[in-house]
């Protein structure tokens, strides 16, 4: 006995009107419907044909980075000694710079670029600093900042305002540039030594940069020299900073600094090294404060290292009648 299922397959259990399959040509359809079916069929066949023949592909030729011509090697101890030597080699600095500032970023949804200013930087170890910016054309003071490492003064003559206090930021200002402190400048201008008690690690990485001379992409290997601190007597280690060192010349091209919670607070970029008094120093430095929302771009036009600087050159006098804001 045939099963109901086999009868269904043979069409014996299918209703008569359902079992009859009529050709497409016998169906009553409007001319528009028939035209649509013909077009859809042709389009489907065309797509299948093009896809199988490769006509739908498009290959783009990408620039392939070239390997670095020179790759240098160094042990962790040699990297530490190199950073320490560079710090010890600079006792003082007298520089003429072009200063460009910008505030905002992706989190703000916009970036505001300020007019470039000519300025001067004085630095003397261990912590003396003075940064002066001049207004365009008239070249009167736009701002003047001085610090002895413990206290600082920031004078803004166009507004007859001044800020006096320690190096920290207790209450951030709505104006990001008002949160700029001398220690941010100092630690970016001179990469500090690595202490005897610091915990250090070294990793290797690769970055792709465009060569400023050949304009070609170059794949440069680097060393990442990380400095850690231990949280009390615990096993917890927190990052303090990471110095990124190019293996093409063993010079730093970036430093990342972290706060007590492990957040990046300052990223400083170094490029266009030149030799001054037998010391290689970058002539372009970018200080990025992502959380504060500002960047300071410094282009060095003139630099003198290790010449005597007097205490008077770091003394900032606030004119009478200036509105002074004292901060902790």
Mark where each language-model region is.
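Extended lipid/amphipathic-ligand handling interfaces
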Residues: 82-83, 118-123, 145-147, 268-275
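Gly/Pro-enriched, hydrophobic low-complexity segments
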Residues: 56, 201-321, 325-328
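An acidic-aromatic
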Residues: 57-58, 126-187, 322
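Amphipathic hydrophobic-ligand
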Residues: 110-117, 141-147, 262-267
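Hydrophobic lipid-interacting interfaces of membrane-associated proteins
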Residues: 100-104, 136-138, 150, 157-159, ...
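N-terminal leader/targeting segments and the immediate start of mature chains
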Residues: 55-116, 320, 326-328
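Flexible, processing/modification-adjacent segments and terminal tails
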Residues: 74-77, 156-239, 318
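Sec-dependent bacterial lipoprotein signal peptides
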Residues: 2-55
């Amino acid at each position: 006995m045939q099963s109901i299922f086999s009868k269904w397959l043979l069409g014996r259990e299918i209703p008569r009107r359902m079992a009859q399959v009529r050709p497409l040509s016998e169906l009553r359809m409007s001319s528009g419907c028939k035209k649509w079916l013909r077009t859809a069929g042709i389009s489907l066949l065309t797509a299948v044909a093009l896809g199988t023949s490769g006509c739908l592909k498009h290959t783009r030729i990408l620039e392939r980075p070239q390997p670095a011509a020179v790759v240098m090697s160094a042990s962790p101890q040699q990297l530490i000694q190199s950073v320490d030597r560079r710090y010890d080699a600079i006792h003082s600095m007298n520089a003429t710079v072009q200063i460009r500032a910008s505030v905002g970023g992706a989190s703000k949804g916009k970036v505001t670029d300020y007019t470039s200013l000519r300025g001067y930087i004085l630095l003397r170890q261990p912590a003396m600093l003075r940064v002066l910016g001049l207004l365009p054309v008239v070249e009167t003071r736009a701002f003047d900042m001085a610090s002895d490492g413990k206290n600082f003064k920031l004078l803004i003559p166009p507004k007859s305002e001044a800020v006096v206090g320690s190096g920290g930021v207790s209450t951030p200002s709505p104006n990001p540039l008002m949160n700029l402190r001398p220690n941010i400048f100092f630690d970016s201008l001179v990469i500090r030594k690595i202490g005897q008690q610091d915990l250090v690690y070294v990793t290797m990485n690769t970055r792709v940069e465009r060569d400023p001379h050949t304009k070609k992409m170059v794949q440069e290997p680097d060393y990442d020299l990380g400095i850690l601190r231990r949280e009390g007597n615990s096993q917890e280690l927190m990052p303090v900073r990471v110095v990124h060192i190019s293996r093409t010349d063993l010079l730093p091209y970036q430093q990342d600094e972290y706060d007590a919670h492990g957040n990046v607070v300052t990223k400083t970029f170094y490029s266009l090294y030149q030799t001054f008094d037998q010391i290689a120093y970058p002539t372009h430095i970018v200080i990025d404060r992502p959380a504060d929302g500002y960047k300071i771009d410094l282009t060095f036009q003139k630099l003198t290292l290790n010449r005597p600087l007097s205490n008077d050159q770091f003394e900032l006098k606030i004119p009478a009648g200036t509105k002074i804001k004292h901060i902790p």
